[in-house]
Amino acid sequence: MEKKAFFQQLDERTDIRYTDSGMKIIRLKFPRAHLRLCNVKIDFGSRDVCLQAESGDTLLPYGTAHFLEHLLFWHNGRNLYTDFFAHGALLNAFTTYTDTNFMFTSLPDRLRQTIPILLDALWNHSFDKKMITQEKAVITSEIQTAHLNHQLYYHYQLISMLSPASPAAVFPAGRIEDIEALDIRDLQKAYNAAYQPQRMTLFLIGGSEDTEALLPPHLRLEKRPNHKAERKIISACPPPALSQKMVLGNEERIEDTWTGLQVGAIPGQNNLLTLKLYWDIASRILFQLDSPFFQEIQQTYRLEIDCLSAEAHMYEDGGFLILHSQGAHSSAYIDVASYYVTQQKQQIETWLQYGKDSLTDAIIYDSDYVRKCFEWAAECDRCDCTFLDMYRIIHDMNSQDFLSLIDALASSKKAVIHVSQKEAIGQ
């Protein structure tokens, strides 16, 4: 099947409805799936630390969204995981920068029992001071454990070096002082503001049944007429300040280099989804060991690079790239790669085709797995686009777009953590 036709087919298998209370329902049919994946996404994530109201703004401690996620696993004195397990369903939950998610897999004939249980827990929570105290201990331990993960530490340390005031610089669970500061009033205010039907999206992925056949009958569905997609943009970065550098161990024997870059709009382009996809393509070209670009540059400069990776954090309130290179020449890789692109512009189209194929193939491959397919469907929902919109953006990226990203690599504000060989081995 032609790739474009595959993306069109994903859209044809997607049905979007709304309940009369305003909750969005996204149904993605997946004929070969035995189980059904259900995810309730709440538009309240770790970045949401300010509640706005006519009476005034309320500042919340970091980690509030994640704390609520933990609390809502308890309903009427019972643990939701146990209740779902009794129905043959496995319930999980996770908090991201933008939202909170409650996800489970289930046999199709159990959804009419499990979905009402989850929605009742999300819409009718009763706060218990004893449970809050219990979860404070649990989450404090979770934060302490996260600090032992060097990769997580470097990720948040780099963003903190680049933008100390950004919520993105804080682990989603918050800091220990935030958890200690949380009180029942903060949690009640956040819950009352966030856990409303109009801030929720229910994803149903798997099987070929109509949407109504999987949902409890009391959820009356309707189409939303005359919907106009919201164009989400990312602003340009402030002028770069002096780069910051942290060295762990002996600077003469660098083994690992972690680089954070603050990124935003590029000349002529500020669309958030477009830039997310562009950076994904560029990362596949520059930071995959099996890419033609890396093979060429390694042979040309005899680079000793054993590991490369890139992770993008891009949202309306700012963007960051976290790059990791490992090997004797890890600290020089970004500069060498940027220079090589400018010297070999005639090859950009070839490299670009590799990056585009790599990304579209990944989406097609992921669509065979319900959990991965959900992630792409959630991205479409977050950016208010279709699968075909994503394909067109990928297809239309050109050499000048790629060069603009290379310019950003060279000119953006940077934070670098160098880890010496001894420190890296000790980890």
Curated annotation (Swiss-Prot):
Binding note for cofactor: Divalent metal cations. Binds Zn(2+).
Keywords assigned: Antibiotic biosynthesis, Bacteriocin biosynthesis, Hydrolase, Metal-binding, Metalloprotease, Protease, Zinc
UniProt cofactor(s): Zn(2+)
Residues binding Zn(2+): 66, 70, 142
GO BP of this protein: bacteriocin biosynthetic process; proteolysis
Top-level taxon of origin: Bacteria
Active-site residue list: 69
Protein purpose: Required for production of the bacteriocin subtilosin. Could catalyze some step in the processing of presubtilosin.
Name of the featured protein: Putative zinc protease AlbF
Name of encoding gene: albF
